[in-house]
């Protein structure tokens, strides 16, 4: 903006304002006028050792696909553009289509085999699950019967304890009776074991 005003002032030399000298504030500051408070620590940077610059230099140059349409150009240059042959592009597309069709058939075949195998596995798992369920029910019945056996064993132990406490009392009572009224010695063991 300042340069435009100065050029306008030069183009109108007969103007009344042209004789006015610019104020000292509009003068550019000289290096002598600048006071440096603290010198900054700005090391001299060597661009050739910068890793980013080295990586950018390692990128290979390449030409655009359609020569003549470089960035910034709106219309192609007078150089003859290379054109693609439509028949070859069509053959390329047809080959690619055939390749995709073959890949799709292979995937569909594998998918069908996988679905069939999954159905077989589902059937096997269902059969195994029903078998295990029946076995679990059977074992639950066995566990219930074992629980009954344990209960009966506890009852028999209590009966045995009662007999063990009662037999000495019976023997004592029997010893207090007269000789003619005494009973035979009481025994829980069967007669077979007594005879042996």
UniProtKB/Swiss-Prot annotation:
Its main location: membrane. Signal peptide: none annotated. The keyword Secreted does not apply. One of its GO terms (cellular component) is cytoplasmic side of lysosomal membrane. Keywords: Lipoprotein, Lysosome, Membrane, Myristate, Phosphoprotein. Myristoylation at Gly-2 mediates attachment to lysosome membranes. It is found in: Lysosome membrane. Pfam families: LOH1CR12. One of its GO terms (biological process) is organelle transport along microtubule. Residues 1-32 are annotated as: Disordered. It comes from the Eukaryota. It is a lipid-anchor. The modification Phosphoserine is found at residues 71, 75. A lipid is attached at residue 2 (N-myristoyl glycine). Disulfide bonds: none annotated. Residues 1-22 have a biased composition (Polar residues). Belongs to the BORCS5 family. Component of the BLOC-one-related complex (BORC) which is composed of BLOC1S1, BLOC1S2, BORCS5, BORCS6, BORCS7, BORCS8, KXD1 and SNAPIN. Interacts with ARL8B, KIF5A, KLC1 and PLEKHM2; links the lysosomal BORC complex to the microtubule plus-end-directed kinesin motor. As part of the BORC complex may play a role in lysosomes movement and localization at the cell periphery. Associated with the cytosolic face of lysosomes, the BORC complex may recruit ARL8B and couple lysosomes to microtubule plus-end-directed kinesin motor. Thereby, it may indirectly play a role in cell spreading and motility. This is BLOC-1-related complex subunit 5. It comes from Bos taurus (Bovine). The gene is BORCS5.
């Amino acid at each position: 903006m300042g340069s435009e005003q100065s050029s306008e002032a030069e183009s109108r030399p007969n103007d009344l304002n042209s004789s006015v000298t610019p104020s000292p504030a509009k003068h550019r500051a000289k290096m002598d006028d600048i006071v440096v408070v603290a010198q900054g620590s700005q090391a001299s940077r060597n661009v050739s050792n910068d890793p980013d610059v080295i990586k950018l230099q390692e990128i290979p140059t390449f030409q655009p696909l359609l020569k003549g349409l470089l960035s910034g150009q709106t219309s192609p240059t007078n150089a003859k553009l290379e054109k693609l042959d439509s028949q070859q592009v069509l053959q390329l597309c047809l080959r690619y289509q055939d390749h995709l069709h073959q890949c799709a058939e292979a995937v569909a075949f594998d998918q069908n085999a996988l679905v069939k195998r999954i159905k077989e596995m589902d059937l096997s798992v269902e059969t195994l699950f029903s078998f295990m369920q029946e076995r679990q029910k059977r074992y639950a019945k066995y566990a219930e019967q074992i629980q009954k056996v344990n209960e009966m064993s506890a009852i028999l132990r209590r009966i045995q304890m009662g007999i063990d406490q009662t037999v000495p009392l019976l023997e004592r009572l029997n010893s207090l009776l007269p000789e003619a009224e005494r009973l035979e010695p009481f025994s829980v063991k069967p007669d077979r074991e007594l005879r042996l």
